[in-house]
């Protein structure tokens, strides 16, 4: 569903970012302004601030604003309900489970489903399961847009002084 997006937009769609103006601009580019109010991200401040300090929390500063925007865009394109996209009963979540099962096996089920700090359902995983998912992404990097988006734009994935960005830049 993201075929016609730029690499920057794809990178912010999988990011857990610092909330800088660069991150906010990329996340906002995913949605028409009329859909901005549908975002269910928590209110937040930029993680790292230089110069003039931001004191008013906004949804776009949330480290998951790009994920939320991309999911809303995908829901629109698929004709899914956009009002409840963060619920574990939403078609998006079932699609997410299928992607995880691609790496962990079709019969895999999480022991627990909870809500994370970004408002999304999150799954319980063992360290071995997480490693299998990351290994699967690396193994399929030539067939998967996620790897290319992250390596093309590591600063959008995390940002200044973030371990994920540093690792991507070092290994790329």
Ranges and model annotations:
Residues 1, 121-151:
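Active-site-proximal alpha-helical segments within enzyme catalytic domains
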Residues 4-120, 125, 136:
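Active-site-adjacent helix/loop patches that line small-molecule binding or acyl-intermediate pockets
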Residues 144-172:
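Conserved SxxK-family serine transpeptidase/carboxypeptidase catalytic domain
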Residues 52, 56, 130, 157-158:
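Short secondary-structure transition/capping segments
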């Amino acid at each position: 569903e993201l075929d016609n997006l730029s690499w920057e937009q794809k990178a912010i769609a999988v990011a857990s970012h610092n909330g800088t103006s660069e991150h906010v601009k990329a996340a906002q580019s995913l949605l028409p302004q009329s859909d901005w109010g549908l975002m269910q991200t928590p209110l937040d401040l930029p993680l790292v601030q230089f110069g003039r300090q931001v004191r008013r929390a906004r949804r776009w500063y949330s480290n998951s604003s790009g994920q939320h925007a991309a999911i809303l865009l995908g829901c629109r394109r698929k004709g899914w309900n956009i009002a409840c996209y963060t619920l574990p009963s939403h078609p998006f979540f079932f699609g997410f489970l299928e992607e995880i099962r691609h790496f962990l096996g079709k019969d895999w089920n999480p022991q627990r489903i909870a809500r994370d700090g970004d408002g999304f359902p999150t799954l319980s995983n063992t360290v071995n399961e997480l490693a299998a998912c990351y290994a699967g992404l690396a193994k399929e990097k030539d067939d998967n847009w996620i790897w290319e988006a992250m390596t093309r734009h590591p600063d959008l994935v995390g940002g200044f002084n973030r371990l994920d960005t540093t690792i991507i830049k070092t290994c790329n």
